[in-house]
């Protein structure tokens, strides 16, 4: 079906997003990391509001909502990329025995929402969450409990080890 074909194409994109997130983490932490397939599948197939990414895609395709589909794909890519960064940081932390901190970084333009401007430059330990002034919280960009804090988010994490200088 058309929906299955589109979902399969987007799956390829999300696999690439995860690979790129692992590579970004390896670069930030100067450590060789490889993709853990189970962690990648868990990140890609995360159920949000009772739906997988395939269900969310189907909703937009069936409704012929191309704009909504584009926004969904951009948000899914961002979510999976950031999940990979966090997974890679946990892998580094467990194998190297060094603590990792994560810093919230926005793109610093006029489109950054106020709840994310509030987080600019905030650093927390890897296992801690970021808290916005509206009461929302997330371990990383794209993981807030409120959809309005995730959709079109372009924020990223900067990861540093306990021995790094910021």
What are these language model-derived features?
Residues 1-150, 158-166:
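Domain-core detector
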């Amino acid at each position: 079906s058309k929906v299955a074909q589109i979902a399969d194409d987007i799956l390829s994109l999300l696999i690439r997003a995860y690979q790129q997130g692992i590579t970004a983490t390896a670069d930030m932490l100067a450590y060789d990391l490889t993709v853990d397939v189970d962690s990648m599948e868990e990140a890609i197939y995360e159920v949000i509001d009772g739906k997988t990414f395939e269900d969310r895609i189907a909703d937009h395709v069936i409704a012929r909502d191309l704009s909504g589909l584009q926004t969904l794909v951009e948000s899914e890519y961002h979510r999976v990329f950031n999940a990979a960064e966090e997974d890679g940081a946990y892998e580094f932390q467990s194998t190297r025995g060094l603590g990792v901190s994560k810093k919230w970084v926005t793109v610093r333009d006029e489109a950054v929402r106020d709840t994310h401007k509030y987080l600019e430059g905030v650093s927390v330990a890897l296992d801690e969450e970021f808290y916005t002034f509206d009461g929302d919280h997330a371990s990383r960009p794209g993981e807030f409990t409120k959809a309005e804090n995730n959709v079109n988010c372009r924020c990223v994490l900067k990861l540093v080890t306990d021995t790094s200088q910021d």
